Amino acid sequence: MKKGQIKSGGILLLTAIIWGIAFVAQSVGMDYVGPFTFNCVRFFIGGIVLIPCIAILKKWNGTEGESNKEDLRTLWIGGICCGIALAAASCLQQIGIMHTTVGKAGFITACYILLVPVFGLFFHKKCGILVWIGVLMAVAGLYFLCINENLMIGKGDIFVFLCAIVFAIHILVIDHFSSKADGVKMSCIQFFVSGILCLVPTLVLEHPHMAQLLAAWQPILYAGVLSCGVAYTLQIIGQKGMNPTVASLILSLESVISVLAGILILHQTPTSREVLGCILMFTAILLAQLPTPSKKSRQ
């Protein structure tokens, strides 16, 4: 492996670590503020953090030219569509985390990796055999992870699974606009759009006080600065020149790190049944990202 690829791999691993630990920040934040308040503030922070990142990445990529009106229109439409999906997915996730462990939330959220190619069938995108094997394993993993001995599923797990469905839609929206608009600029817009959308239920339903926000400043700042702003920028830099399959495999470690973070920081020890579910889920995620034999032969 080349030196540049090792560096990129390290950057992507750091991204996965930041995102994995973010589940802990999201859980701790719920001790002080409501889910809409948490998301509202962190998205505004993430958008603000990305503003200087846009200038830095312009110099990094050597792109200083101005965009035409059509490009700007596509950028704004993409940012707004992504922002709507991100707000919906994140609020579902945040509500779910209130009622489940961070490890389970991390693995259930990671289902979007399997759902994206399945949803892609509606857009005439074919799925390889490994994806379908992964889907079957994921269903088995979800059974052990979410359904207890009494055949009951937790309310939090349902919300997080719904979040995974919306995150899959979010990825498809990004995929549609990513080739037509600057990724970091679009992400900056989506964060502000998500923040505005979360502001309405924040003011109507939660009525946060400054004392609550100050008490939750550490998890909110982590989620806003590191998870939204820094990690996204690191992902863009890390994926440059890196094989997409390898990149996605490294980033999928986020789910494993969320479990470890839950154990080490929150002392949330998974049951043997949940561990089996996590193993099946992670194997399914890996399978879904591996190239099929037919793809290799064409390469």
Cite the ranges covered by each PLM segment.
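Helix-helix packing/entry segments at the starts of transmembrane helices
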Residues: 39-41, 105-111, 174-195, 228-264
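Hydrophobic transmembrane alpha-helices of multi-pass small-molecule transport proteins
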Residues: 50, 127-147, 167, 198, ...
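Hydrophobic/small/kink-forming positions within alpha-helical transmembrane segments
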Residues: 20, 24, 83, 87, ...
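C-terminal-most transmembrane helix of multi-pass membrane proteins
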Residues: 43, 51, 59, 216, ...
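C-terminal transmembrane-helix exit sites in multi-pass transporters
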Residues: 49, 54, 112-133, 256-275
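Glycine-/small-residue-enriched transmembrane alpha-helix faces in small-molecule transporters
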Residues: 1-40, 83-84, 88, 92, ...
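Transmembrane alpha-helical segments that form core, pore/gating elements
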Residues: 50, 116-117, 152-206, 234
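Specific transmembrane alpha-helical segments of multi-pass solute transporters/efflux pumps
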Residues: 22-23, 55-109, 144, 224-242
